[in-house]
Amino acid sequence: MNTPRCDQTAAWAALAAHHQGAGRQFDLRTAFGADAGRFDAFSLQAPEVFADLSKNHWDATTRGLLLGLARQCQIESRRDAMLAGEPINHTEGRAVLHTALRAPRGAAPFSDDVHGVLDAMLAYVEQVRDTATSGIKHVVNIGIGGSDLGPQMVVPALDAYAQRGLQLHFVSNVDGHDIAPVLRDLNPRETLVIVASKTFTTQETMANAQVARTWFLAGYGEGGEAAIAKHFAASTTNVAAAAKFGITTTFGFWDWVGGRYSLWSAIGLPIALAVGAENFRALLAGAHAMDRHFATAPLESNLPIQLGLLDVWYRNFLGYTSRSIAPYHQGLRRLPAYLQQLEMESNGKCVDLDGASLPYGTCPVVWGEAGTNGQHAYFQMLHQGTDVIPVEFIAVKTPNHGPDVADELKAGLADQHVKLLANCLAQSQALMLGKTTDDALTDKAPTASTALDALTVARHRTFPGNRPSSTLVLDRLSPASLGALIALYEHRVYTSGALWGINSFDQWGVELGKALCNQLLPRFASGESAGLDASTAGLLARLRG
């Protein structure tokens, strides 16, 4: 598809001119004071997700110019090409069809194949979850990257829907300090091990799988080799390699499923084991609802596209190089780590689709922590630091602590949830309003003694304010709403990547380190350092000693 790069459009030039004028001087407090309808004008409702974008550094003019940029970059036709299965991952010659994994039967390419694997996987899930028959009480998922981050994020998020008596464990790091404590107290006869690797060759995953196999055989005793077939399963396309390992239960997926978009596929096996077939299908349905919103909503009300446009405005015109994710729900504590891979592995690119170096920035650094923990860690910098860092708050209206919460705890837990939500709103409000030096002077002075005069102390207690934030609201954290939220971020990433003119679906930056690691491994045994740079040679010698 022949589309202009964003910086070559008239809309880009118009945005640059706008930034040099009113856009650079934008003040949230002034904007809200001048427009009583700003909240309504800059709020959007998508499936399962409400978004308040009113506390961001944009006005109607800015948004209109950004929508013009989207149209001049042909974002709608590029979106349609992805959804139709065109090979938009051009460096690998592949389609990008994670949306097909959650589409109803017959509604997307490869539907029969997708639903064949899904039905088989969920039938297996129900067998394992019948713990009285299967005898399985623990599931150990071994994977890394997309084979780990997605399931490890979703399982705790949906804890209220999880089956009690079946405990999930995740192992990813090649460091033995990851797997050793997981296996330490498990009984092989009560454990299912999932090996999640598309090729069944991923270094870290296969190293951990071999350790798990050794542990299993040693602990199981007589008949262990034969029992591997019952106690191991694999999410892989390399059935032959899995069979050689002793695994006969395998669930495959396709080369058009990128790792960081794969939790909807057989990689989601541990999710389905945790929450069951019905809830896994609800997760898929929620994501599909967001897919349809992305595919059909006009640009003016299309939430993924609006967020992608805001990302471009912040990164390329206002110069904000970082974004903090603050989910005010402990179940979403792994979401920032998941989004780090989704966004930074997708859009951390420095060349355009033709391989030309980009003259502008792309992906911001994405980081964060669950609220309120983050307030006591890094929010100081958000409020008074020298960098402006947009914050993305995620709030859940109604708590769900699961069906097994004791009655005597319910009132206290409900009160805690109100406190949680109040903290969320207070932080977004404080970032916007700030505190003037005059206000700080009228506040009661700190009780700690100080030799500083009142004005100096007040300056230390001044907040600049005008710090931007968005707030996403879910009514409940359910399989459907979580599916929609994840899909929202996926489509937002594609939107900003398409506007930047990059391929969001390869990850060549990961490959060089893998190749060099394979070259270095034999040197740890031999000590040979010929041809290495002085730093690597010196570190090799120190680490071998």
UniProtKB/Swiss-Prot annotation:
Gene Ontology MF terms in the entry: carbohydrate derivative binding; glucose-6-phosphate isomerase activity; monosaccharide binding
- Write down the chemical reaction(s) this protein catalyses: alpha-D-glucose 6-phosphate = beta-D-fructose 6-phosphate
Biochemical pathway: Carbohydrate biosynthesis; gluconeogenesis; Carbohydrate degradation; glycolysis; D-glyceraldehyde 3-phosphate and glycerone phosphate from D-glucose: step 2/4
Q: Where in the cell is it found?
A: Cytoplasm
Q: Which residues form the active site?
A: E345 (proton donor), H376, K514
**Keywords, sorted A to Z:** Cytoplasm, Gluconeogenesis, Glycolysis, Isomerase
Keyword Acyltransferase (UniProt): no
Extract one GO cellular component term from the record. Answer: cytosol
* Signal sequence residues: none
Q: Per the UniProt entry, what are the Gene Ontology biological process annotations, in alphabetical order?
A: gluconeogenesis; glucose 6-phosphate metabolic process; glycolytic process
InterPro entries tied to this protein: G6P_Isomerase (IPR001672), G6P_Isomerase_C (IPR023096), Phosphoglucose_isomerase_CS (IPR018189), SIS_dom_sf (IPR046348), SIS_PGI_1 (IPR035476), SIS_PGI_2 (IPR035482)
**Entry's CDD domains?**
SIS_PGI_1 (cd05015), SIS_PGI_2 (cd05016)
Q: Which Pfam families match?
A: PGI
What EC number(s) would the UniProt record show? 5.3.1.9
Q: Which PANTHER family match?
A: GLUCOSE-6-PHOSPHATE ISOMERASE
Question: Which family does the similarity line name?
Answer: Belongs to the GPI family.
Task of the protein? Catalyzes the reversible isomerization of glucose-6-phosphate to fructose-6-phosphate.
The protein here is known as Glucose-6-phosphate isomerase
Task: Give the gene that encodes this protein.
Answer: pgi
